[in-house]
């Protein structure tokens, strides 16, 4: 950290300051900024006269717009009466079934670390660490061993990209944008991941949205909805990017490098258009269900500014179900 401070001071004449002084300066600066200041700033933010528009693309694309076309398009957009974005909150009952949950059957406290370990009747283990280091901030992670190592070679292309496709999936009856309107990502979010060795969830919340975070956790295990449109869009984007990348000399180098490094192992080959075309809806859906069908073999870690009497019933209800 100190080396970076000195480097920026030498290169950019940036002030060298301690974290305490930086905090003091930031607090003084922030308290002087008003809402009127921000509104005035953003009114002129997009009206600068020194704008630069840059378009890059591979040589095989011959119909890129020229300077006159770009100026015309820019002027058309600038002259439009663009209304502010309206947040439409879709009122929907996310979880329609009654959740019976699982009771806490064992509770162990580790005095040296302050960690509390809960074991639920369904087998899930939850490690809780209460901390006041960041006010009203709660972080959750859950993981289980397995990942794409559990996928057969015949479904590996779909398994490899299941995690990426799930990030675009509907959650219950909500699209991604509808979910974000209901649960603003500034305050709460949760998503799944699958890598080579494990599958899991990662998320965060404030206390106000804590129940919402656990609802999202339950739905990520039980009701992520992938359809053919998600698959088509994913493949279209990947294949388009592949066709651009292969024009670059780096592509040939990376391709040859991986072939030599991993000795032609089929799970480490550089993905091609043929590889992407093997991704299909059935395999993605089945692999997702296989990896997340049971929370009983997951470990969960929750760290943050929570109260035990508030979070434990949510753990029993949602992780327990």
Spell out what each predicted region is.
Residues 1-32, 50-57, 127-129, 134-223, ...:
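M16 family metallopeptidases and their MPP-like homologs
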Residues 46-47, 291-293:
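Edge/loop elements at the starts and ends of beta-strands within beta-rich repeat scaffolds
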Residues 219-226, 318-321:
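A common structural junction motif
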Residues 4, 8-145, 149-152, 299-301, ...:
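Proteolytic maturation boundary segments
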């Amino acid at each position: 950290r100190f080396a970076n401070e000195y480097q920026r001071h030498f290169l950019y004449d940036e002030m060298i300051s301690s974290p305490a002084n930086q905090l003091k300066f930031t607090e003084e600066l922030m308290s002087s900024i008003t809402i009127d200041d921000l509104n005035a700033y953003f009114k002129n933010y997009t009206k600068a006269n020194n704008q630069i528009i840059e378009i890059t693309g591979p040589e095989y694309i011959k119909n890129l717009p020229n300077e006159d076309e770009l100026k015309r398009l820019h002027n058309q957009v600038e002259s439009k009466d663009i209304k502010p974005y309206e947040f439409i909150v879709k009122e929907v009952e996310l979880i329609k079934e009654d959740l019976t949950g699982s009771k806490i059957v064992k509770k162990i406290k580790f005095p040296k670390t302050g960690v509390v370990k809960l074991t639920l009747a369904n087998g899930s283990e939850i490690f809780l660490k209460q901390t006041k280091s960041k006010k009203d901030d709660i972080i959750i992670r859950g993981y289980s061993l397995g990942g794409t190592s559990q996928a057969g070679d015949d479904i590996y292309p779909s398994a490899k990209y299941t995690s990426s496709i799930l990030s675009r999936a509907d959650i219950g009856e909500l699209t991604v944008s509808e979910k974000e309107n209901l649960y603003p990502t500034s305050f709460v979010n949760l998503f799944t991941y699958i890598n080579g060795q494990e599958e899991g969830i990662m998320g965060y919340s404030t206390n106000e949205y804590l129940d919402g975070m656990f609802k999202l956790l339950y739905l990520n295990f039980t009701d992520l909805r992938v359809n053919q449109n998600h698959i088509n869009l994913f493949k279209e984007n990947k294949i388009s990017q592949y066709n651009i990348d292969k024009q670059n000399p780096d592509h040939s180098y990376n391709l040859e490098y991986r072939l030599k490094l991993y000795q032609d192992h089929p799970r480490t080959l550089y993905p091609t258009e043929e590889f992407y075309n093997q991704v299909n809806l059935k395999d993605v859906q089945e692999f997702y269900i296989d990896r997340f069908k049971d929370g009983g073999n997951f470990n969960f870690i929750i760290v943050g500014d929570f109260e035990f009497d508030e979070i434990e019933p949510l753990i029993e209800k949602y992780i327990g179900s």
